[in-house]
Structures are given as structure tokens and as C-alpha cells.
Amino acid sequence: MSGWFFYALWYNEASTVAERISILSYKFLLFDLDHTLLDFDTAEDIALTHFLEEQGVTEIQTYKDYYIPMNKGLWRDLEQGKITKSELVNTRFSRLFSHFDIGKDGAELALLYQQHIAQQGQTYAGASELLDSLTEADYEIYGATNGITAIQTGRMANSDISPYFNHIFISEKMGTQKPEALFYEKIAEQIADFDLSQALMIGDSLTADIAGANNAGLDSIWYNPKKLMNNSSV
């Protein structure tokens, strides 16, 4: 399915969307979190500001301009199996400061940053209304996220959407990640009476959410609010 279907969610058309999902006979809705329901860009910006201020950085925007694309690249490498989660977490901040000729302990910085980002639970406008509508329609709602357990758990606890979820499946805790089929297989093992034909994956990432759903044999909806062209093989 194309992005227009889920794009309507952020225009207070949750009831219409719920009706469409009902027609398609889904029961289990698997939502990606970051960039789908949780506003990661805002969360990251606030957390980085506090973190960099603590480190005595004065040129905060300059550091952000380097870190943000570098971090995205590391997450892409993780999705493709080029690096491990430990490498990503424990080296991204040492790489950041090394770029500015400053030596820092990456693992120590990771823990400090984690304290800031875990407090950020910002969601997109309309997210709670959508989930409320789907909950009233008796869907089982689950989170399916690639991320760090302490961070994602903290952010959800600080959000207004946590009560709508039956469970949050986090890649670090599961020992596997999207787009691996094993990620979805482990989800299926933990949900009572789970049926692939009644499950729908909803997310913003073609390479993680949609490709992962394809690998596992699930239907999916690509959340594409920026109306990006799909130039991938997915």
C-alpha cells in the first residue's frame, strides 16, 4: 500500500483510517515509533542541546550539523549488518568529538546522552487521537522499534501514547532488528493467537519497516508525510 493511506492519520481522519483497516480484516497493528508516532527530530535536537552544553560545547549547531547525518549513517550501517549495536552506541560520540580534535570516551558519553534523550517523549500531532480511535475499534496495538531499550522505554514513558500499546518490541532487547524476518518471528511468538494474515506493519522506513514486513510476509503501510519518491527496490 502507498503512503497516502497512512498520511491521512495526521489530518484527524483516524476514524476513516480505522474503517479502512477494518475492511481489510486486520487485527494486529505493529507501529514503528521514531518518525512515525514519536517526533524523533525534536527529541534529538533537545537532547543534543542539553548534552553538548554539559560537555562545554559552545558551537552547538556546528556539532549537530556533523553528528546528525553521521548518526543516521551509522543506523543505516546497522540495518545492513555492517556494524553492531555496540559499535554504534559506543563510538558515535567519540567520532563526533574526534572530528573536532577532542578525545572523549564514547561509552561514557553514550550513557550521558541516554539520560537526556530518554526524557523526550514528544509525539506528532494527531498520534494519540489515531491510537485512541484504533483502540476503541478493538485493535491490538504493538510497537516495533529498532532502538536502545533504556532510551525507547524512557521516551514512551514520557509520552502520551504509551497506554495504547499492548507491548513494545525493542530490537536491542529482542536480539534482532528490522528488517530481519527473525524480528517479526519473535514478535509472533510472543503475541497470543498471532496470525500473519491479520497483521499490519506501519512505519516510515522503507529499508527497515517495509522491507522487514516484506521479508516476514506481513502487509505494510509506508508512512510518507514528506511524499518522498520510492527509488528503492522495496
Task: Please provide the spans of the model-predicted regions.
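A short, Lys/Arg-enriched amphipathic alpha-helix followed by its capping loop at the start of a domain
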Residues: 51, 130-137
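N-terminal helical cap/lid subdomain that shapes the substrate entry/recognition surface
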Residues: 23-125
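Hydrophobic, well-structured mid-protein blocks that either form specific transmembrane helices
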Residues: 119-131, 141-144
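Generic recognition of short, well-ordered alpha-helical segments
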Residues: 42-46, 125-129, 154, 181-182
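Asp-based, Mg2+/Mn2+-dependent phosphohydrolase catalytic module
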Residues: 7-12, 17-29, 132-135, 142, ...
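A generic structural signal for short
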Residues: 81, 118-119, 140-141, 197-198
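Secondary-structure boundary/capping positions in well-ordered alpha/beta enzyme cores
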Residues: 58, 103, 138, 194-195
